[in-house]
Amino acid sequence: MMQPSIKPADEHSAGDIIARIGSLTRMLRDSLRELGLDQAIAEAAEAIPDARDRLYYVVQMTAQAAERALNSVEASQPHQDQMEKSAKALTQRWDDWFADPIDLADARELVTDTRKFLADVPAHTSFTNAQLLEIMMAQDFQDLTGQVIKRMMDVIQEIERQLLMVLLENIPEQESRPKRENQSLLNGPQVDTSKAGVVASQDQVDDLLDSLGF
């Protein structure tokens, strides 16, 4: 027994589909022009390469700061290790002397070594302080990168706002797709789709896109 042939859900020919896509594209372009959004979208598109360059700048500045900090730590480590080793050795020698006092000649040598250690400490600490200052100065990139990131966030928000305005103005309510069955969105904020630019939070953006089937 032959199985009945299954007709495709969309009976439009390829030519009809292409014609409809072309018509929708023309309608979208005309609507953008009428709303004055074409220039805004163009500016947003031009901002994308600029944002990419800014991201690269942030990466460079962060990498340079990390390298400066690591170099300072590596330079300071031998000085700290030397002071620690010398201090432990002198402490052990003094403990031994107090437990069993040695001859005056040996005691004089211990005192001389201790004085030498104390005389060397300022040089080690001065070098370490200079490296700590270098680490602190390396963090100045945060001011610059913070400004760059803020600018990028503004660009992204503007692109999102313009795209939402296009959706709101060009998708009739009766043609919007059914909402996805997602209970977490049923109690979300209500959005007045009769006005452009009224979306106030990311949750509202998600709800709006969900209601449109995107």
UniProtKB/Swiss-Prot annotation:
Gene3D superfamilies: Helix hairpin bin (1.10.287.500), Single helix bin (1.20.5.590). Keywords: Chemotaxis, Cytoplasm, Flagellar rotation, Hydrolase, Protein phosphatase. The record marks 147 as: Enhances dephosphorylation of CheY-P. The keyword Cytoplasm applies. GO terms for biological process: archaeal or bacterial-type flagellum-dependent cell motility; chemotaxis; regulation of chemotaxis. GO terms for molecular function: phosphoprotein phosphatase activity. It comes from the Bacteria. Its main location: cytoplasm. Its EC number is 3.1.3.-. Residues 174-199 are annotated as: Disordered. It holds the Pfam family CheZ. GO terms for cellular component: bacterial-type flagellum; cytoplasm. It is found in: Cytoplasm. Residues 183-193 have a biased composition (Polar residues). Homodimer. Belongs to the CheZ family. PANTHER family: PROTEIN PHOSPHATASE CHEZ (PTHR43693:SF1). This is Protein phosphatase CheZ. It comes from Escherichia coli O157:H7. The lineage of its organism: Bacteria, Pseudomonadati, Pseudomonadota, Gammaproteobacteria, Enterobacterales. The gene is cheZ.
